[in-house]
Amino acid sequence: MINYKNLNELENFKILERIDPEVLKTVLTGKRIKEYDITIEGDSVHYNYASKQINENHLKIFQNLSDEANLIEKYKEILNGERVNISENRKVLHHLTRGQIGKDVIEDNKENMREFFQSELEKIYNFAKQIHSGNIKSANGKKFKNVVQIGIGGSSLGPKALYSSIKNYAKKHNLALMNGYFISNIDPDESAEVLNSINIDETLFIIVSKSGNTLETKANMQFLINKLKSNGIKEYKKQMVIITLKNSMLALEEKGYLEYFFMHDSIGGRFSPTSAVGLVLLALCFTEKIVKEILKGANKADKKSLNKNVKDNAPLLAALISIYERNVLNYSSNCIIAYSKAMENFYLHLQQLEMESNGKSVNRFNETINYKTVRIIWGGIGTDVQHSFFQMLHQGTDIVPMDFIGFNETQLKEDVISDNSSSNDKLKANLIAQIIAFSKGKENSNKNKNFKGERPSALIYSKELTPYAIGSILSHYENKVMFEGFLLNINSFDQEGVQLGKTLANQILKNDTFEDEAIESYSKKILKQD
């Protein structure tokens, strides 16, 4: 029988609450750095936790807590197609987009879901080949050179993170066949800026909306249609691809578009980058070969996440450490720093992934909980952020745990030697220096120059940021968030918190504000400029 208890009801969490953090200054040795290291997918992508404030005693309690909370058994429920998203009575099938690990998952209409995702994937590959070969051309007979994805939230953040992570790698390996762009915000300046910067005659547009009725996406789609028409493109649907649910408004009512690819309601937007939501654009921009490597990395990491041993399961251990830091040590945020310009959009995806998933105040049974849930997720790119907010991280009054991400080699393989070292060596040296500085600090009798240290961090690293590596890292964070949700006893797969604002916005747009003085007053100031 699987145990669904609140975090503070678990006996091993009560034990964990009494355990002090490890003192990093005294234990951070070469031996520890070597031993406190796990491969995320069993091969070349590593998670190192030597600079976390834990020791063997913590690890023992983590193991007992994981076993008590049945974390691996709950993961297996997801893989086997149980309706884990209980508030919406849905399965959670994003793992199935990159390979089958559990039992056959059969939907109510008798459809095998792995076969559904695989057939969509083959359709994506075939469509990309037709575009690349020039067999499918624009409305005016031009070969497509650009792709613009229009969507918001998970229809933009994850795909954009993967696109920017892989773009330079694809260029170096002659696999960058089209240029990718994104429009997400309802601010018309964004649509205008993107559309005015490209040749529309040579651009394919991907419209992503699960329901087919997303406010921002509908508005931006209409902006696009107007732009296409004003450029003399009457058959504008020949340049538009739709990604949506099979039974959505877009699928049922809007016909004649170049192609339709289908999502499934068992996958929330923030977990959708390895579905059609992310893969259509990636296959068009970077080819089938790149997509297959992303899926391979994610699938291998998914499989390794089944390991019951917390010392050999990176996302499971990362989740347990996160709970310890949030609910015992009271650290309220987590900073993601990638020492790779290509990953500049990745922490933005992780913000949504973690905060939308676990930013809840009721448990899976709709009961109010009395312990902390998700941390604030934020971040940036090294070394840039060393010259902005690292002052606060080093000497501020709040301790902020960090995830560092780094790679041994660059993607474009171009560099320069200055002051007897390459720029890439300088980049890596700064990454190492920050981990040590945060962990050990440096005493100084001048309080203004004193560094206390004891700022914990983890390091994810690999030889190079490849499609395989980014797939593995994506899976790591998805599964970490999942395990955190299990520990917190919340439903990580719904997002009721986004609904109220949508409802009020529609009310304001309909001028239905007279019953609320605050809404009416703000409307006069901002909308009507009274």
From Swiss-Prot:
Keyword set, alphabetical order: Cytoplasm, Gluconeogenesis, Glycolysis, Isomerase
Recorded coiled-coil stretches: none
Catalytic residues (UniProt): 356, 387, 502
Presence of the UniProt keyword DNA-binding in the record: no
Enzymatic reactions: alpha-D-glucose 6-phosphate = beta-D-fructose 6-phosphate
Entry's localization field: Cytoplasm
UniProt xrefs under Pfam families: PGI
GO cellular component: cytosol
PROSITE patterns in alphabetical order: P_GLUCOSE_ISOMERASE_1, P_GLUCOSE_ISOMERASE_2, P_GLUCOSE_ISOMERASE_3
Pathway: Carbohydrate biosynthesis; gluconeogenesis; Carbohydrate degradation; glycolysis; D-glyceraldehyde 3-phosphate and glycerone phosphate from D-glucose: step 2/4
UniProt enzyme class: isomerase
GO molecular function: carbohydrate derivative binding; glucose-6-phosphate isomerase activity; monosaccharide binding
The protein's Enzyme Commission number: 5.3.1.9
Transmembrane annotation, as ranges: none
GO BP term, example: gluconeogenesis
Entry-linked InterPro entries: G6P_Isomerase, G6P_Isomerase_C, Phosphoglucose_isomerase_CS, SIS_dom_sf, SIS_PGI_1, SIS_PGI_2
HAMAP family cross-referenced by the UniProt entry: G6P_isomerase
Family: Belongs to the GPI family.
Function: Catalyzes the reversible isomerization of glucose-6-phosphate to fructose-6-phosphate.
PANTHER family found in the cross-reference section: GLUCOSE-6-PHOSPHATE ISOMERASE
Protein's name in the database: Glucose-6-phosphate isomerase
Taxonomic path: Bacteria, Pseudomonadati, Spirochaetota, Spirochaetia, Spirochaetales
Encoding gene, per UniProt annotation: pgi
